């Protein structure tokens, strides 16, 4: 299998997952939106987004689906398949709609738009993102106060998914330190090599720098 990726948040998540699982995949940097590249990638993913997992005669897109397939391929409980599976899916779903969504809202304004010249920062959207971040963090904080991971006693894909945008917090500036249980949980993730530096040894051009607004 081959994993097509970039350094953006969701492809990063897929690479971190594959490397954490030590999955039997090769990694290939891709740029579906590069001039002349669209038709090559459209047959693999009509959305022209990454990540994409490619096998013989098939392709699979979306980071969550890729995590499920890779986990099942090696028999890992990183993607739960027992009684914990509904709980894991609950946190994946809630995270994408609440916590990670809020992180993305702020990161898009302060990070993505400034990297790619997509316009000035919309401070109202930043403020709304912070409001939603605090609301979601107020739910997540007590959940993590008495345990190390979101599901059961071991790490799961729900932890990776919840933290999708936190590696980019140097640009977003979300106040993790206001929530000590979340901070400790994320520090545990950062102690995992595959999460902290998923691109080590891979050919993967750096993201454009975040440009400060004049």
Residue ranges and their predicted role:
Residues 1-123:
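GST-like domain detector, emphasizing the conserved glutathione-binding G-site
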Residues 195-214:
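Terminal-tail/helix-coil boundary detector
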Residues 35, 186, 206-207:
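Generic structural signal for helix capping and beta-alpha/helix-loop junctions
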Residues 31-34, 158, 203-204:
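Conserved beta-strand edge residues that scaffold enzyme active sites
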Residues 71, 165-166, 199:
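Active-site-flanking alpha-helical
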């Amino acid at each position: 299998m081959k994993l097509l990726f970039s350094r953006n948040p969701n492809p990063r998540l897929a690479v971190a997952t594959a490397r954490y699982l030590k999955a039997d995949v090769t990694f290939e940097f891709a740029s579906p939106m590069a001039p002349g590249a669209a038709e090559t990638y459209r047959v693999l993913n009509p959305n022209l987004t990454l990540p994409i997992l490619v096998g013989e005669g098939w392709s699979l897109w979306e980071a969550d689906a890729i995590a499920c397939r890779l986990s099942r391929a090696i028999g890992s409980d990183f993607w739960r398949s027992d009684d914990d599976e509904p709980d894991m899916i609950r946190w994946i779903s809630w995270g994408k709609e609440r916590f990670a969504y809020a992180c993305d809202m702020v990161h898009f304004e302060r990070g993505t738009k400034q990297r790619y010249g997509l316009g000035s920062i919309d401070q109202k959207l930043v403020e709304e993102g912070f409001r939603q971040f605090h609301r979601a963090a107020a739910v997540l904080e007590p959940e993590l106060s008495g345990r190390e991971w979101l599901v059961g006693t071991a790490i799961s894909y729900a932890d990776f998914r919840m933290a999708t945008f936190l590696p980019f917090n140097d640009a977003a500036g979300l106040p993790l330190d206001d929530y000590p249980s979340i901070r400790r949980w994320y520090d545990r993730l950062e102690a995992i090599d595959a999460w902290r530096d998923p691109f080590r040894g891979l050919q993967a051009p750096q993201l454009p720098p975040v440009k400060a607004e004049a």
